[in-house]
A protein has these predicted regions:
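Gram-negative/organellar outer-membrane beta-barrel architecture
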Residues: 1-135, 212-216, 228, 292, ...
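Small/polar glycine-rich anion-binding or flexible loop at a beta-alpha turn
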Residues: 254-261, 274-278
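Transmembrane beta-strands of outer-membrane beta-barrel pores
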Residues: 1, 6-8, 24-28, 49-57, ...
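Outer-membrane beta-barrel channels and translocator barrels
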Residues: 9-11, 38-42, 96-98, 148, ...
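A short alpha/beta connector and helix-capping loop motif
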Residues: 272-287
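Short, glycine/charged-rich beta-strand-loop motifs at protein surfaces that mediate ligand recognition
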Residues: 266-272
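Membrane-embedded beta-strand positions of outer-membrane beta-barrel proteins
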Residues: 20-24, 45-49, 101-105, 160-162, ...
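C-terminal outer-membrane beta-barrel translocator/porin domains of Gram-negative envelope proteins
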Residues: 30-31, 60-62, 73-77, 89-90, ...
Length: 314
């Protein structure tokens, strides 16, 4: 995708007066992000909006921890085309140096497209409301703390979210939810580090749609491979900094990493003791001391997956 950023540096900067970011992704569609910081930089208003592209889809393998992978079918069999419009404002405030509190709202529209010969038809009938336009409102709050408790411990970041969503057409279909995560980065030497993230989600009612369910992010499986009412997963990487590549254009660092993931979901009425795992590794490149690209290959009981990522930091 491509992005355009416009930043205004007025009299009051924290570090800027405001910023607009507009982008387009081939699969996800159009996206907008606006940042409006307070003059002292301790409070910020965010406005996020998106309109999906006609190619946007979400995987659906059914509910539960033991769903089949349908390896004999083509990938499209488990794909559901989704038309979405989203508007998500949020207000962020610094409580202390290490603590941030965010209050957010959401107004979302979802419509799953009817497509013949797809798995979703075996779960939902042709006239099911999932194939009509559904509007949702939501409210919530997130507390995040980044701190090093003791000098001998790594820097820890933990985040806790509590929220609620409701279907505007059917107000009785609403549910509260909670999420929690913990991440850390242990540096054994200048070149060798261990990074890890643990994350869990709990839905406190059964009135949610498949695209709102709790899921796990294991790199050897397709997205939303397992969904349910509760979820937990952890992924970890061992990273080796191989040094710098000399070139006349930009500073370029590179390295190797190996990773291992595990997790599972829980769904009412299902008895499962399985924990899913994936493993693999890859290479990373950092340029301008800011942007990192990752090329990875992860395997699981389903298959192997190649992934390319571009982002800030590692």
């Amino acid at each position: 995708g491509t992005f355009f950023t416009y930043t205004m540096y007025g009299f009051k900067r924290a570090p800027f007066t405001y910023q607009h970011r507009i982008g387009y992704n081939y699969l996800k569609g159009f996206m907008y992000a606006g940042i409006f910081p307070n003059y002292d930089g301790r409070r910020r208003l965010y406005l996020n909006a998106s309109i999906s592209s006609p190619r946007n889809f979400e995987n659906f393998f059914g509910f539960g921890n033991n769903t089949a992978g349908y390896k004999e079918e083509k990938k499209n069999y488990n794909r559901v085309k989704l038309r979405t419009y989203m508007f998500n404002p949020s207000f962020e405030m610094d409580l202390r140096k290490e603590e941030v509190m965010t209050f957010f709202g959401s107004l979302d529209m979802y419509k799953a497209k009817r497509t013949d010969d797809r798995y979703i038809y075996t779960v939902y009938g042709e006239d099911h409301p999932i194939f009509r336009t559904n509007y949702f409102v939501g409210l919530g709050a997130t507390y995040r703390i980044t701190k090093q408790p003791y000098s001998w411990l790594p820097l820890l970041e933990t985040e806790w979210t509590a929220g609620w969503k409701m279907n505007l057409k059917k107000p009785e279909r609403n549910f509260p939810y909670a999420q929690g995560s913990l991440s850390w980065n242990v540096r054994f030497s200048d070149r060798f580090t261990w990074a890890s993230l643990m994350k869990g989600t709990v839905l406190f009612d059964n009135d949610y749609e498949f695209y709102q369910a709790a899921t796990i992010d294991l790199r050897g499986f397709r997205e939303n491979r397992f969904i349910g009412k509760q979820s937990f997963y952890q992924y970890s990487d061992l990273r080796l900094d191989m040094g710098k590549l000399k070139n006349p254009f930009t500073p370029l660092k590179y390295g190797l990493f190996a990773g291992f993931d595990y997790g599972r979901v829980w769904f009412p009425g299902e008895r499962s003791h399985s924990w899913h795992t994936s493993y693999g590794g890859g290479i990373w490149l950092t340029f301008l001391n800011k942007f990192t690209t990752k090329y990875s290959w992860f395997g699981s009981t389903d298959s192997f997956r190649f992934a390319f990522e571009l982002g800030l930091g590692f």
